[in-house]
Amino acid sequence: SRLDGKMLFVKVPSGDRMLSIDSAEVIHGMFKMEGITDSTSMASLYMDDESIMPFVIEKGKISISIDNARIVVTGTPLNDRLYDFVGKKTSLDDRAYELERQESRMIMDGKAPDEIQREITREREKLAAEMNALAKEFIQKNYDNVLGPGVFIMLCSNFPYPVMTPLIEEIIEEAPDRFKNNSLVKE
């Protein structure tokens, strides 16, 4: 395995930084970490200083699979829910990539620039609406557990500075106080 000999670290948010709470070396493509948790929390698996994937620390046996094509976490209810969402988002990301390729093909095929612009813009807007709906619905369905705030923070961290997009405003406006008062969301 290309990961053999690498150290993996589990880190959780602590104030404004990520705190390492466990680590393991990958041997023959496998690693194992065990522990007892008194609460459910979002975490990230790191290789060196690079976050490679989010997951939920919760009671149960968590299985993490990393290969060249994808990363999947299963075995517990919230991780199953999170990676179902990740799979749907990846599918939309793939469609967005394919849309860019389609635009290039249309140019190469000699289609009229205004026709290309119209068609590609329509498809981009449709895809953006699907992505926003997916994120909003997922966060709303998970207001009451760590996934709602966790994915909300990931959505916000896509921007180089704090910004209130219409999507972020909608999520906040419709959220219960418990979500709004979460320390991660308040920041």
Model regions: which residues?
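Charged, long alpha-helical assembly modules
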Residues: 140-143, 147-187
